[in-house]
Regions:
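Recognition helix of helix-turn-helix DNA-binding domains
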Residues: 174-210
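Regulatory hinge/linker segments at domain boundaries
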Residues: 138-170, 224-236
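Short, flexible helix-to-coil linker/hinge segments that flank and couple to helix-turn-helix
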Residues: 93-96, 107-156, 220
C-alpha cells in the first residue's frame, strides 16, 4: 500500500509533534518533513513534494494563505490543509479562496483529523461543506458582487456566478440547509453539491487572477494606474507597448481560468 506523504508546518513544536505522533501510529501515513515556519516549508515542499501539506494559517515568517496560493499554483498535485486558531467565517472564506482543501482548529479530535487527511488524500474538498452555512454563502455573494467592476476592466475574464449558482447561494444564505435547498429549488442534493464545487473553483481561480491583475497594475506607469493622461511627469509608453501588455495580461488570466 502506497503511503500518504504528509509535511507539517506549525510554530508550536509540541502541537506539531502531536500530529506527527498521531500519524506515525497509522500504517497509511508517512511524515516526510516538518518545520516551524511556512517559508521554509515551501522550499522543502518544492524539493520533495508530499501528498499533503499541513500548514499553520498564521505564521510570523510566512502567511499560510500566501504559501497555500504558491503551492497550489506551482505544485497542484500537493493538497493543503490549514491549521486555524478558530473557525471564523471570514478566515474560512480566505482559506477557501487560497485553494486549501480543508481546515481544522487545534482542538480537533485526533480521529476526526485523520478522517480529514484521508478524504483530502483522495481528492475530496471537506472545506466545501463550509459553503453550506449562511455566513459563508453571504460572503461568496458579496465577493462576486465586488468583483463585477474589476471584471469589466479585464474584459470579462473573471468567472461570474451562473443564475442557478446564485439562486442556491441565496437560498443557503436565507438559513436553509441542503435538504431544504433541494426541496425549495427542486434539485437533487448531488446537483447542489456539483454547483457548490463549481462555485468553489471559481472563487479560487478568481483569487489567483486578481493576484496577477494587481501585480501587473503595479508594474504600469503611474498615469495609467490612476487613469490620468498628464504625460509631463510620467514615463511614456507607446500604444503598441500598452497593447502588448494587455495581451500578456489576458493570456495569463486565461491560463488561470481555463
Amino acid at each position: 500500500m502506497e503511503k500518504v506523504k504528509v509535511f507539517l508546518s506549525d510554530p508550536q513544536i509540541l502541537f506539531r509533534e502531536g500530529i506527527h505522533f498521531i500519524l506515525s501510529g497509522e500504517e497509511d501515513f508517512e511524515v516526510t518533513g516538518e518545520t516551524t515556519n511556512n517559508e521554509e516549508a515551501f522550499t522543502l515542499i518544492q524539493a520533495n513534494p508530499p501528498s499533503i501539506a499541513i500548514l499553520s494559517m498564521h505564521n510570523a515568517k510566512a502567511d499560510g494563505l500566501d504559501v497555500t496560493h504558491r503551492i497550489r499554483r506551482n505544485l497542484p498535485s500537493v493538497y493543503v490543509i490549514l491549521i486555524m486558531d478558530k473557525k471564523d467565517p471570514e478566515e474560512i472564506f480566505l482559506a477557501i479562496k487560497s485553494g486549501a482543501s480543508a481546515c481544522f482548529t487545534k482542538d480537533t479530535e485526533p480521529e476526526h483529523l485523520l478522517d480529514i487527511i484521508r478524504v483530502v488524500a483522495q481528492g475530496s474538498l471537506p472545506i466545501m461543506e463550509e459553503l453550506f452555512t449562511p455566513a459563508l454563502a453571504s460572503l461568496v455573494i458579496t465577493e462576486f458582487e465586488d468583483l463585477a467592476a474589476l471584471n469589466e476592466e479585464v474584459g470579462g475574464l473573471l468567472a461570474n456566478l451562473a443564475p442557478k449558482e446564485l439562486q442556491i447561494l441565496n437560498t443557503i444564505a436565507a438559513n436553509n440547509n441542503i435538504e431544504q435547498v433541494a426541496t425549495k429549488l427542486d434539485l437533487s442534493e448531488d446537483a447542489i453539491r456539483r454547483n457548490i464545487r463549481l462555485i468553489l473553483n471559481k472563487l479560487v481561480s478568481n483569487d489567483q487572477a486578481r493576484t496577477v491583475i494587481e501585480a501587473t497594475q503595479r508594474s504600469l506607469p503611474s498615469f495609467i494606474r490612476s487613469g490620468k493622461r498628464d504625460l509631463k511627469n510620467a514615463d511614456y509608453i507607446t500604444r503598441a507597448e500598452f497593447n502588448e501588455f494587455k495581451d500578456r495580461l489576458m493570456e495569463r488570466l486565461k491560463s488561470l481560468i481555463v
